[in-house]
Amino acid sequence: KDIADIQWAVGSDIDYVALSFVRCATDIEEVRRLVQRASVSSGKRCVVKLIAKIESARGLANVDEIIREADGIMVARGDMGVEMPIETVPIAQKSIIRKGYLAAKPVITATQMLESMIENPLPTRAEASDVANACFDSTSAVMLSGETAMGKYPVQVVRTMRSIIDAVEKQFDYVDFHHDIPPEVKTGDIPAIMSYNAVSVAYLCNAKALIVLTETGHAARLLSRLRPRMPIYAFLSDERLFNQLALNWGVRPFLHSGTGTRLDVVVDEAIAICKRSKLLAEGDKVVIIAGLPLSQQGSTNMIRVETIQ
């Protein structure tokens, strides 16, 4: 059945597949091979990304290799609380979130976040604190399950979670977070250095936004892990990647025409899209991150500051 489900996911252009009870990197490698075979047999590009659910003691013990191999991580606290002592779950959650963002991989915190709202129109204070603390830990996303799948107040629970997230993000110390320098910056990785310095420049010039031109989404993910105060507008020409980037913290993806090969042409198109969307106005400063030549993957090597005309 798992093979049939993977074949269906590939054939249906599903963006992410979540794997339950991942024990080690080999589990992910095996599913990735199945995805590749299904892509070949269906004549589609192999673009499905894999999210590893950490919900067992063995998975937690091997979390570093799992994060390296997966495209994203889910902290599945329900089964985790059954598989290991309950008092270790909050500690594991914080550790996984930190490891995930340092690896520039999105982390989803899930299970029983607003559980009481299955039956009640308001959450408990403890549940509100649970959602807030996951956000303060810098999780990429928080996920509802039974609350919206079978609860009495599915719309209200989403609004409640949204309001908690908004309140936290108004209090989040983004500048202090930026001082937590990623390890690749210290070891000389050029794209990591460029992303870190782009955010530094954005703070120094009080930029309204970061605009990143990306072919693979990697540059946008590197910016996302730095949790900048200003939004990240990612411009790309691949529709599947456009959908997948929506999971990354602070990233708002946009599709551009993909016809421009000169930097100025693509930047002008990106700025025009932002102005039409009323995201940028005359006088706003933006920091632009790109790689030259534009069509070359993994070449992030340019930072530019522009004032919107």
Predicted regions and their residues:
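Non-catalytic helical/linker scaffolds that mediate oligomerization, partner binding
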Residues: 1-309
